[in-house]
C-alpha cells in the first residue's frame, strides 16, 4: 500500500523515530487495555486482546508493559474509550480514513477536523470515503524471516488472499505483507505464527482500491496533515489512498 509505505519512509527520513516509537507503545498499551476491558483479561478467550498482545510482542514491547496494560483494565479503572471512524478528503482529493479510540469524542473530533481544515482538506460523512477502500486483514513479517516464495507458500496454505513484499532502504529492512479476508485474520495469524513466530504486526486495515498521485506543493501539505493526525493522542490509525513519486519524496529531505 503506497500510502502506508511512503509515509513510513518519510517519517524515517524526518528523524521522528524516537517520538514514533513512544507513540507506538502508547497506542499498543491503549488497545490492550481497551480489549481487556471489553472482552476480559484472558488472552485465549478474547480474540481482540490476543491480537493486541501479538502486535505488542511483534514490536518488542516489554512483557511488563503488556501485563501492566492488561492489569489497568481489570483494576477498576473508570476510563471509558469509544472507537470512532472519521472519513474525509485531503490535498489533491485523496481519501483519508482516521480511526480513533478516545475518552473525549469532542476533543478527538476537533483535533481531526483541525488537521483536515488547516491543510486543504475536509471531513465527510460516514461512508463518503470507505467505499474507496477494502477492510481486510494485514499481517507483516520482516523480509529476513523467509524468502518470498517460502512466505507466499506458507501464507496461501494458511488461508491468505494476497502476499506482497515492500523493499527496504538504509533505514528499513523491508517487509512481507500478507492480506486476508477480514474474517480470516486470526486464523491466518495462527497458521503463520506456528511457522514464523509472532508477526511484527497483524490487524484489520483499510486497503485502498486505487491510488491518487500527489505532486508538487500538495506533497508537503499532505505530509503536514498526516503528521498532525498521527500526533494526536486519540488517533490509532490513519489510512489514505495516495502515492508520491520518488522525485517528490526527495524534495522533502
UniProtKB/Swiss-Prot annotation:
It comes from Maricaulis maris (strain MCS10) (Caulobacter maris). It comes from the Bacteria. This is Probable transcriptional regulatory protein Mmar10_2433. Gene3D superfamilies: 1.10.10.200, 3.30.70.980. Belongs to the TACO1 family. GO terms for molecular function: DNA binding. InterPro entries: Integrase-like_N, TACO1_YebC-like_2nd/3rd_dom, TACO1_YebC_N, Transcrip_reg_TACO1-like, Transcrip_reg_TACO1-like_dom3, YebC-like. Transmembrane segments: none annotated. The keyword Disulfide bond does not apply. Keywords: Cytoplasm, DNA-binding, Transcription, Transcription regulation. PANTHER family: TRANSCRIPTIONAL REGULATORY PROTEIN YEBC-RELATED, TRANSLATIONAL ACTIVATOR OF CYTOCHROME C OXIDASE 1. The keyword Cytoplasm applies. One of its GO terms (cellular component) is cytosol. GO terms for biological process: regulation of DNA-templated transcription. It is found in: Cytoplasm. Pfam families: TACO1_YebC_N, Transcrip_reg.
